[in-house]
Amino acid sequence: MGEAILAALLEKKLCKPADIAVSDIMEPRRRYLKKQYGITVTTDNKKAIVDRDVVVLAVKPQNIPEALTDLKGQLKPDQVILSIAAGVTINTISAGAGHNKIVRAMPNTPAQIGLGISGWTATQEVTAAQKKLARTILGAMGKEIYFDNEDYLDKVTAVSGSGPAYFYLFAESMIDGAVDLGFNRKDAEALVLQTMLGTAHLMEKSPKAPAELRRDVTSKGGTTERAIEVFEQSGLAQIVNKAMQAACRRAKELGETKP
């Protein structure tokens, strides 16, 4: 996701390669990033943050303690930490880095192609201008929604953060179902992918609610109605709700666990 951010910023010319420095312990990764984007690369977190307006934390939760230790005492008062580390709370970041200007965001994987959505929040010390900058950075990857309460970040994780996996799972099931009907897998994948893509675009452009669009497709006594009956009898809505509640609970658990 860190690469998604820098790629989006460079593609949309919101900054220049010289404005970006990345710290990574993996030599092949550093070599790739330097060649691909022309940015500065280093293994030293302290060097990477020098003269940067925003310090992006794009590391796995288990690597957060080491990263925060490197940042402690090195950040200038006007620098902002933008964390996309899943399940890592603002309190954890603030305590570890000894810093109070923090933006916490939860993007999702479609950000890699500029079609993501990020939920985010910020501490009260983050200025209006810095919030605008955070909005610009996150918006470069797609859309963004600001929340006053950090608790919503766990909910965002359950909806849009984990959401792509839900759609992949449903797509898998539809593809397998099409194969069972007799289609070869290539044709099954094409039918399902274009149906999902077209439906998403139609839902985005139509003023109608999803339920109304569904009813438009569902003729009384027809094939779609029969399929919908099976979904409803199997408790699809309840299953989806239960899954999202479980994801939200897990996000809270991860936030309560010291990384």
What are these regions (language model features)?
Residues 27-28, 37, 45-120:
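Rossmann-like NAD(P)(H) cofactor-binding subdomain of soluble oxidoreductases
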Residues 20, 48, 184-191, 213:
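Small-residue helix-packing motif on alpha-helices
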Residues 193-259:
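NAD(P)-dependent Rossmann-like dehydrogenase/reductase catalytic/cofactor-binding core
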Residues 1-36, 40-43, 179-181:
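NAD(P)+-binding Rossmann beta1-loop-alpha1 motif at the extreme N-terminus of oxidoreductases
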Residues 102, 152-158, 210-215:
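Short pre-catalytic strand/loop immediately N-terminal to key active-site residues, enriched for Gly-Thr
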Residues 93-101, 117-155, 166-205:
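Internal alpha-helical scaffold of NAD(P)-dependent oxidoreductase catalytic cores
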